[in-house]
């Protein structure tokens, strides 16, 4: 006997199905209607029978897409966000506050007054001070063209230190300049002490003392487990000359090849102690000047001194010291490949400089 087409199809499907049927079907035990008529009530987290109202399941999770805010959604004053703003680790408040919504018509003035009164009552004074300081730090970093990572590191250092008793009596400018210098050291962004000093009206001695205090505070808090900051870059002393060279070469319009040659000179000048005791800026200026002479570039020592904020005599004196050890500080591959020649370097003497024959 042949089976109907529908029955044969069901038999074929059941024959292909292997293993247990894991489909979960929720049905009402009271109504016993199939297919069941159930309703998901996400507001209560329940699944109920639409016929008798019996709760079939509870504590369900709403898997639908969340409300989203688009650029033009605030035209009517509505904000669909239900989770509030993201927490800011640089502030101390928990950011859990009640916000009074906007009203239309005659109630607008009342809600505005309520918002003003509430803001005065719940504002955290400490957070206000931190935000004002962060705004000043951001402005100073922007003036020095520092990247965002330096700003964040400086703000983190400021938050850890600004309430310390040992900083009482120190000016805010000296503290901010010091934390910016800390941020530069942590992010390995080359900035000299003189460049940071130019952002403030504070004496160099005061910033130096404040920087030492902040450095000790951060190291102590890190050792005690109150902070997780790598202080190795902060406590290593002066920034190396090689970190300044790429930026100053860029300001002078020099190529990468010249910058690399200057970095090589600055790095290997330490091996012969030819410029021992000189500041990193002085070493960088002398190395850049020597590299420009090697490549026969028309860059005067006056221009280099103005760019690096040193005297012209400092540039020439540094070059004179490097010239005496030129075979040890200049990259030998440049000479061997014929890219540059020793004759390109002006010969120096105690009296004057003259061109080598």
From Swiss-Prot:
Region of interest called Disordered, as start-end residue ranges on this chain: 69-90
What ranges of residues constitute the TFIIB-type zinc fingers?
Answer: 23-57
- Keyword set for this entry? Metal-binding, Nucleus, Repeat, Transcription, Transcription regulation, Zinc, Zinc-finger
Q: Where does Zn(2+) bind?
A: 28, 31, 49, 52
The UniProt entry's GO CC annotations, sorted and at most eight, read: nucleus; transcription preinitiation complex
Location in or out of the cell: Nucleus
Q: Name one GO molecular function term.
A: zinc ion binding
Instruction: Note the Pfam families from the entry.
Output: TFIIB, Zn_Ribbon_TF
Q: Where are the sequence repeats?
A: 140-216, 248-324
What Gene Ontology biological process does one annotation of this record name?
transcription preinitiation complex assembly
The protein's matches in InterPro entries, at most eight in alphabetical order, are given as: Cyclin-like_dom, Cyclin-like_sf, TFIIB, TFIIB_CS, TFIIB_cyclin, Znf_TFIIB
Query: What is the stated purpose of this protein?
Result: General factor that plays a major role in the activation of eukaryotic genes transcribed by RNA polymerase II.
Give the family from UniProt. Answer: Belongs to the TFIIB family.
Subunit (UniProt): Associates with TFIID-IIA (DA complex) to form TFIID-IIA-IIB (DAB-complex) which is then recognized by polymerase II.
Q: What is this protein called?
A: Transcription initiation factor IIB
What organism does the record attribute this protein to?
A: Kluyveromyces lactis (strain ATCC 8585 / CBS 2359 / DSM 70799 / NBRC 1267 / NRRL Y-1140 / WM37)
């Amino acid at each position: 006997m042949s089976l109907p087409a529908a029955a044969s199809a069901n038999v074929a499907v059941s024959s292909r199905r292997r293993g247990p049927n894991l489909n979960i079907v929720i049905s009402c035990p009271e109504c016993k209607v199939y297919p069941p008529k159930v309703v998901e009530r996400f507001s209560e987290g329940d699944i109920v029978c639409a016929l008798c109202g019996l709760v079939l399941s509870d504590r369900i999770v709403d898997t639908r897409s969340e409300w989203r805010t688009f650029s033009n959604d605030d035209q009517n004053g509505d904000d669909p966000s239900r989770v509030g703003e993201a927490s800011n680790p640089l502030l101390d408040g928990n950011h859990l506050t009640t916000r009074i919504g906007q009203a239309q018509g005659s109630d607008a003035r009342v809600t505005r007054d309520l918002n003003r009164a509430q803001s005065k009552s719940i504002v955290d004074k400490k957070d206000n001070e931190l935000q004002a300081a962060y705004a000043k730090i951001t402005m100073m970093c922007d003036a020095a063209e520092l990247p965002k990572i330096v700003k964040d590191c400086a703000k983190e250092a400021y938050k850890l230190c600004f309430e310390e008793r040992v900083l009482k009596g120190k000016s805010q400018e000296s503290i901010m300049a010091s934390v910016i210098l800390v941020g530069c050291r942590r992010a390995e962004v080359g900035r000299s002490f003189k460049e940071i000093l130019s952002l403030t009206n504070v004496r160099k001695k005061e910033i130096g003392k404040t920087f030492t205090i902040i450095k000790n505070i951060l190291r102590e808090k890190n050792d005690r487990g109150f902070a997780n900051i790598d202080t190795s870059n902060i406590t290593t002393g002066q920034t190396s000359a090689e970190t300044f060279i790429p930026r100053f070469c860029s300001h002078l319009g020099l190529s990468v090849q010249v910058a690399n040659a200057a970095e090589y000179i600055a790095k290997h000048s330490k091996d012969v102690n030819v410029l021992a005791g000189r500041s990193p800026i002085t070493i960088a200026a002398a190395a850049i000047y020597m590299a420009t002479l090697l490549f026969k570039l028309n860059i005067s020592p006056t221009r280099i001194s103005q760019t690096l904020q040193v005297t012209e005599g400092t540039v020439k004196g540094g070059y004179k010291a490097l010239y005496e050890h030129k075979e040890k500080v200049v990259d030998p591959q440049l000479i061997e490949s014929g890219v540059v020649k020793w004759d390109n370097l002006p010969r120096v003497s105690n009296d004057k400089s003259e061109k080598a024959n």
